[in-house]
A protein has these predicted regions:
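Glycine-rich phosphate-binding P-loop
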Residues: 15-36
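Extreme N-terminal, non-catalytic leader segments
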Residues: 1-16, 173-174
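Inter-motif core of Ras-like GTPase G domains
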Residues: 42-59, 71-87
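A short, well-structured beta->alpha microelement
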Residues: 3-6, 33-49
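Conserved C-terminal guanine-recognition region of P-loop GTPase G domains, centered on the G4
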Residues: 68-112
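Conserved Switch II/interswitch segment of TRAFAC-class P-loop GTPases
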Residues: 51-67, 92-98
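Beta-strand-loop-alpha "switch" segments that mediate conformational coupling across diverse proteins
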Residues: 107-137
């Protein structure tokens, strides 16, 4: 638990903090993709203006177990003044999850208010952080940010934020 503010910039502070359950969880990518979010640097940002936190993990067993541990810490009052909004599970591979991992996600889901699953997005493997579009709640509903406004056709990758990231971002912002 941080006893000093994590946010040291003079810019507007983030509304939501992303706490990585482990290295490589995806916090940097998600913080870049969601305008109101920032990485907490592996600590509970209890001294910051906005204490809202989303735990981020990959969908492999070690990631899910660590996210569950952190969720239980928060639930047990060990996260200072932070308010846990939920857990974002980022797919670690394409395809369907094995049954044991699905069950672990269900256990985590029962322990938190919200759980957002981010599927495997191949486009993220080839994009630099600078190329990632940003979902911003000020730009309107996620539905309008992920489809062409006239034709309702899908927009080419990387010209708009991926629909899965947009809808998860919107869900987190509304939580």
């Amino acid at each position: 638990v941080a006893d000093t503010p994590v946010w040291e910039n003079t810019d507007r502070p983030p509304v939501v903090w992303l706490v990585g359950a482990h290295g490589g969880a995806g916090t940097t990518t998600l913080a870049t993709s969601w305008a109101p979010a920032a990485e907490a640097g592996g600590v509970w940002p209890a001294a910051d203006k906005y204490p809202y936190v989303v735990i981020v993990c990959r969908s492999h067993l070690a990631g899910l177990e660590r996210a569950h541990e952190l969720a239980l810490q928060a639930k047990g009052g060990l996260a200072g003044t932070c308010e846990l909004l939920g857990v974002a599970v980022v797919a670690d591979a394409p395809g369907k999850l094995p049954k044991a991992l699905r069950q672990k996600i269900e256990v985590i889901s029962a322990a938190v208010s919200h759980l957002w699953e981010i599927p495997w997005l191949p486009v993220l493997r080839e994009a630099s952080l600078a190329e990632l579009p940003e979902w911003n709640p000020q730009d309107g509903p996620a539905e309008l940010q992920t489809r062409h406004p006239l034709r309702r056709a899908r927009i080419a990758p990387m010209t708009q934020v991926d629909k899965h990231l947009a809808f998860a971002g919107e869900g987190i912002f509304k939580a």
